[in-house]
């Protein structure tokens, strides 16, 4: 075990990282919640491995809201030509850089950036776009989904908590004119999460949590040619198994 791994193992993390020596990091979240990450990774692989297996060395990926870089590392270890992880919090990027050093992955880089203010032209397009655990923390999740689409060359995976849907109509200027709702956003107060420690919420204290119908409709309207809900595997993390969280794949065909 080298000095970098010793530094990594001296603290607790959001993820269980299995380091090159075989040592595994401790987590500061409850173990029953930490299981979400292995389910996410398995669902990610179930979509991406059939598409890019055998061609990873020609494939590029960006991980938006990468946190400590868990999924960025999973893609870099598959042999991606280039993986870029972006997160708004500098402390997350510092942690991700330390983890990257422990793995020694030259095809992986991290940078600080706010997805809600991001100009896709700055980095170009990627074969794979990940956006896990982000949009339900945002004031403007639609803008984030548009950014994700602009960055996507082949496939984008969105993972999110979802709100209940409402099948209804809205009066539109007169009682004689109505429009059907195509999806719902629930308003959530994240003030305590934002001002607590460790910070896992978004950068604002108001969050809009979408219904599944909203995610599917907006991704199609944003320009994805095909949008599919990724089925959870057996023994999934309970929220994904119950459909309270989902991974949605958006394709550019």
Language-model features: where?
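Conserved N-terminal segment of class I S-adenosyl-L-methionine
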Residues: 1-125, 132, 230, 241-253
């Amino acid at each position: 075990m080298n000095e970098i791994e010793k530094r990594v193992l001296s603290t607790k993390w959001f993820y269980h990282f299995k380091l090159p020596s075989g040592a595994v990091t401790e987590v500061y979240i409850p173990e029953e919640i930490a299981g979400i990450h292995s389910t996410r990774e398995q669902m990610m692989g179930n979509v991406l491995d059939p598409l890019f297996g055998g061609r990873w060395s020609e494939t590029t990926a960006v991980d938006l809201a990468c946190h400590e870089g868990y999924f960025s590392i999973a893609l870099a270890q598959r042999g991606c030509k280039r993986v870029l992880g972006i997160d708004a919090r500098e402390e997350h990027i510092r942690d991700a850089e330390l983890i990257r050093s422990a793995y020694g992955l030259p095809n992986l880089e991290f940078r600080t950036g706010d997805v809600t203010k991001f100009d896709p032209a700055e980095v170009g397009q990627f074969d794979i776009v990940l956006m896990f655990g982000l949009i339900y923390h945002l004031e403007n999740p639609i803008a984030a989904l548009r950014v994700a689409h602009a960055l996507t060359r082949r496939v984008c995976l969105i993972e999110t908590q979802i709100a209940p849907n409402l099948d209804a109509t809205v009066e539109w200027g007169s009682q004689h004119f109505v429009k059907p709702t195509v999806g719902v956003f629930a308003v959530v107060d994240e003030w305590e999460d934002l001002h607590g420690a460790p910070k896992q919420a978004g950068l604002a204290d108001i969050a809009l949590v979408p219904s599944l119908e909203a995610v599917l409709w907006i991704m199609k309207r944003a320009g994805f040619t095909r949008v599919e809900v990724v089925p959870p595997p057996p023994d999934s993390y309970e929220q994904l198994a119950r459909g309270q969280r989902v991974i949605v794949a958006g394709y550019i065909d």
